[in-house]
From Swiss-Prot:
Acetyl-CoA binds at I461, A462, V463, Q468, R469, E470, G471, T472, G473, R474, E499, R506. GO terms for molecular function: 18S rRNA cytidine N-acetyltransferase activity; ATP binding; tRNA binding; tRNA N4-acetyltransferase activity. The lineage of its organism: Bacteria, Pseudomonadati, Pseudomonadota, Gammaproteobacteria, Enterobacterales. The gene is tmcA. This is tRNA(Met) cytidine acetyltransferase TmcA. It catalyses: cytidine(34) in elongator tRNA(Met) + acetyl-CoA + ATP + H2O = N(4)-acetylcytidine(34) in elongator tRNA(Met) + ADP + phosphate + CoA + H(+). Its main location: cytoplasm. It comes from the Bacteria. ATP binds at Q180, G202, R203, G204, K205, S206, A207, L208, A209, G210, Q211, R319. Residues 356-531 form the N-acetyltransferase domain. The keyword Cytoplasm applies.
Length: 671
């Protein structure tokens, strides 16, 4: 085939230039497969094949691709004929050696947007795959507008365009690149203070941080949201690498000459400020775009609090030439570019709502909204883009300035579960997909029917750093109330900080839940709050807030931190307590979900109850209790704790306990 000869010649040119390209094969399954095999046979390479089906020797499923990160391949096939895992696609593009092709297999071009996408099962909260027309149309726009991407469609004439030769590329040798070396010298001679290094993926910022640690005369501590993500840093730091998780570091009195925070944007600013203040020198690194998260907006906000912060940026890719067509195409397709943060929105702010259909008629607006949200929220992934475009029940508001988007709000429909399902969720018998806050209100709250109410959860909210402190966030929430009808509440779940809670409180939200353990990645407790919109919503918020006040002292003792509520000193078992205790004793409600009422039960009961008292009153560990009580493990300990709760309830009121037991055990049987 003349096409293959031309591709062979172009591949050699790409290798000299240090770039990769995308080649799309769109057509019927057999046609795509046959042409991919012909390419594999014509162009020598590894030909990693990413597909849910076992189509080739060097095969890997999209979900297992993470296990290959850090390795390099020449040429790969990404099979998206039945579903498009956007994160896997982006990750695969980053594993390719310079001079490689990424061959993308797609359905028949004209049929693609109406075809159910199997990947939607991961993010749509739907029981069956759904069509994803907005994402498909967006990707088609990007592919057809990209002069460097090659589109080969079945039953369409194909000719390979002529590509103007680029400058020859000189690959990295393993030593620090000139850009890295210059930055490294500046860091090594930096006076006490804070430095921040930002970079897109593949620019060597983790290697730079590791090289810094290996060369400093003193000691360093590394912290990050996840230790597994610091492997490259550890490799370059060598024996001087020492990792402590953010929450553990905050609780300790460890000292060092340097604190290195990898992917700092993933750590809440209040926690980061506390950590930074304890060390004479700090290096923060963060990704400004990529499939693993983005942090440009966070960094702008953080820099505002440190006016003397030293800012550096790595721009030169390590494993391919700058301006690589494949990297550029992936960035556009998955909206990794968050450069909007560099433009300050001007003029008066106007709040308006829009729905997903705007992706068809005016895609620039939702694109800018997504860029703002992803820049402000570090853990924004390609999966979030797909959800925003095509998942059911998504709603949006924008705060538009004259030239740019100044703020954005993303809301998700929740609740409306049947009475039977809500009761089963409350008892711990069922955990259906989605409904984050609605399910939590039932599973961790006092009302078995809480999930029957209909709410709308704040999934994301962001205001451009240059337009903050102007009330724009509150305007967006007020706009959500104005544009929302026939619902019981707005809800929000967030990592608790005093500053964040003051914002939600000013918006009218009522605190209804506080978690009982810190998230290791953030060092924060999870908080949930409601803004009632109906009488039923108001009753639910009042009931759960009252429960939180009753449990406040118990939670404060357990968490070691006071709650922002007025505690009630009430040791009497209420009707809600009896119901919750029966849910723990005879169903599957978790121990710590029932912390307050269990402690009140222990105050009321005269029985020994060693498994419960040992854990909740004496703070013995599960391992200690298993040894003392001669139990085989945590599961058996929990069984014993449930048995003890049942014994205590029967001792207090046998008839009432039997009635509650019979009622609750029926909740696991429904259609």
């Amino acid at each position: 085939m003349a096409e293959l000869t031309a591709l062979y010649t172009l591949t050699a040119q790409m290798k000299r230039e240090g770039i990769c390209r995308l080649l799309v094969l769109s057509g019927e399954e057999g046609w795509c497969f046959d042409h991919a095999l012909k390419l594999r046979d014509a162009l020598p390479g590894d030909w990693l094949w990413i597909s849910p089906q076992l189509d080739a020797e060097n095969h890997c499923s999209p979900s297992a691709l993470q296990t290959l990160l850090g390795r390099e391949f020449r040429h790969a096939v990404f099979d998206a004929r039945h579903g498009f895992d956007a994160a896997a696609f982006a990750a695969l593009s980053g594993t390719l050696k310079a001079g490689s092709w990424l061959v993308l297999l797609l359905p028949v071009w004209e049929e693609w947007e109406n075809q159910p996408d199997a990947d939607s099962l991961r993010w749509s909260d739907c029981p069956d795959p759904i069509a994803t027309p907005h994402f498909v149309q967006h990707l088609k726009r990007v592919l057809t507008a990209d002069n460097d991407a090659i589109l080969w469609r079945q039953n369409q004439p194909f000719s390979l365009a002529h590509f103007t030769p680029r400058t020859d590329w000189h690959p990295a040798t393993g030593a620090p690149q000139p850009e890295q070396q210059q930055l490294l010298q500046q860091l090594l001679t930096m006076p006490p203070g804070v430095a921040a290094v930002t970079a897109a993926r593949g620019r060597g910022k983790s290697a730079l941080a590791g090289q810094l640690i290996s060369r400093i005369a003193g000691s360093a501590i590394v912290t990050a949201p996840a230790k597994a993500a610091t492997d490259v840093l550890a490799q370059f730091a060598g024996e001087k690498f020492r990792f402590i998780a953010p929450d553990a570091l905050l609780a300790s009195d460890e000292q060092a000459d340097w604190l290195v925070v990898d992917e700092a944007a993933a750590i809440p600013a209040p926690l980061l400020h506390q950590l930074v203040s304890r060390f004479p020198r700090t290096l923060l690194t963060t990704t400004v775009q990529g499939y693993e998260g983005t942090g440009r907006g966070f960094l702008l906000k953080f820099c505002a609090r440190f006016p003397h912060l030293h800012r550096f940026e790595l721009q030169q890719p390590i494993r391919w030439a700058q301006g690589c067509p494949l990297e550029k195409m992936v960035s556009e397709a998955l909206v990794f570019n968050d450069e909007n943060f560099t433009h300050t929105p001007q003029g008066n702010i106007v709040i308006s709502a829009f729905e997903q259909t705007l992706w068809r008629s005016e895609p620039e607006t939702p694109l800018k909204v997504y860029q703002l949200l992803s820049g402000a929220h570090y853990r924004t992934l390609p999966l979030d883009l797909r959800r925003m475009m095509d998942a059911p029940g998504q709603h949006f508001l924008q705060a538009a300035g004259e030239n740019e988007i100044a703020g954005a709000l993303w809301l998700v429909d929740e609740g409306g579960l049947s009475q039977e399902l809500s009761q089963a969720v409350w008892a711990g018998f069922r955990r259906p997909r989605g409904n984050l806050v609605a399910q939590s209100l039932a599973a961790h709250g006092s009302n078995p029917l809480a999930a029957t109410l209909r709410g709308r959860r704040v999934s994301r909210i962001a205001v451009h750093p240059a337009r903050q402190r102007e009330g724009t966030g509150r305007q967006l929430i007020a706009g959500a109330l104005q544009y929302t009808h026939d619902l019981d509440y707005l809800s929000v779940s967030f990592g608790y900080t005093g500053e964040l809670w003051r914002f939600w409180q000013r918006c009218g939200f009522v605190l209804v839940r506080m978690g009982n353990h810190r998230e290791a990645s953030s060092g924060c407790y999870t908080a949930m709050a409601l803004l009632p919109m109906s009488d039923a919503g108001k009753q639910l918020a009042e009931r759960e807030h009252y429960r939180l006040r009753r449990d406040a002292q118990a939670l404060a003792q357990w968490n070691g931190e006071m709650l922002p509520v007025d505690p009630l000193n009430d040791a009497i078992l209420s009707d809600d307590d009896w119901l919750e205790l029966a849910g723990f004793a005879f169903a599957h409600r978790p121990l710590l979900t029932s912390l307050g009422c269990l402690l009140r039960l222990l105050q009321t009961s005269e029985l020994a109850l060693p498994a419960l008292r040992g854990r909740l009153q004496k703070n013995a560990s599960d391992a200690q209790l298993c040894t003392t009580l001669k139990l085989s493990g945590r599961k058996m300990l929990l069984v014993r704790q449930r048995e003890e709760a049942a014994q205590a309830l029967f001792a207090l009121n046998e008839v009432r306990t039997e009635r509650l037991r019979d009622r609750i055990t029926q909740w696991q049987f429904f259609h």
